[in-house]
Amino acid sequence: EGIEYLLKAAKYVKELPERNDVFWGIVGGGPDLERMKKLCHEMGLDDIVEFTGRVPDQKLLDYLNTADVCVNCDEYNAMNDKSTMNKVLEYMALGKPLVQFDLTEGRYSAQDASLYAEHNNANDMARKILELLDNPEKRKWMGEYGRNRVINELGWEHTSKALLEGYDRYFRSRGK
């Protein structure tokens, strides 16, 4: 899941006496939503965390456009380490800087559009989020970098040829 790490990061930030300026919006649904809301309440974070549940695409876009930093909190494990997370590319396409755990595929996709926290370390994730919140110029540069990477390197028009060639090789090797 990973939301637990984001809640732990929020708690870390809330406990810093000088930080009362960070609000956490968690958009999306899933089977663990009610459990995460309960955990949030138990951690005393109701005043700084909002769970929206699943929202229509336009509302999702509205939420993302108000974010200063986007977070991919998918935990480090063997599957996530090698999986492309659509949200990473969506954040980049919107010109948003992001923070995520240091996953192989996440680093390949985002490159300099992201700061990378130590594997499954919520406090390090919190520190990286604060680093970006405190540096608007860095956020702007990272957001532009990510958007340009999506447009110039990761868009379908750039990746479809390699994908189709891979399928072609696979089917030829199977005699089809």
Q: Predicted segment positions?
A:
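Nucleotide-activated donor-binding/catalytic signature segment of Leloir-type glycosyltransferases, i.e.
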Residues: P17, D21, V27, E34-L61
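Short acidic/histidine- and often glycine-rich active-site loop of Leloir-type glycosyltransferases
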Residues: K82, L103-Y116
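Acidic donor-binding loop of glycosyltransferase active sites
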Residues: L64-K82, K96-P97
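Conserved acidic donor-binding segment of nucleotide-sugar-dependent glycosyltransferases
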Residues: S114-A122, E131-E137
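A charged, aromatic-enriched C-terminal amphipathic alpha-helix characteristic of glycosyltransferases
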Residues: E137-R169
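A conserved mid-protein helix/loop that constitutes part of the nucleotide-sugar donor-binding site
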Residues: E1-Y12, P31-E34, N123
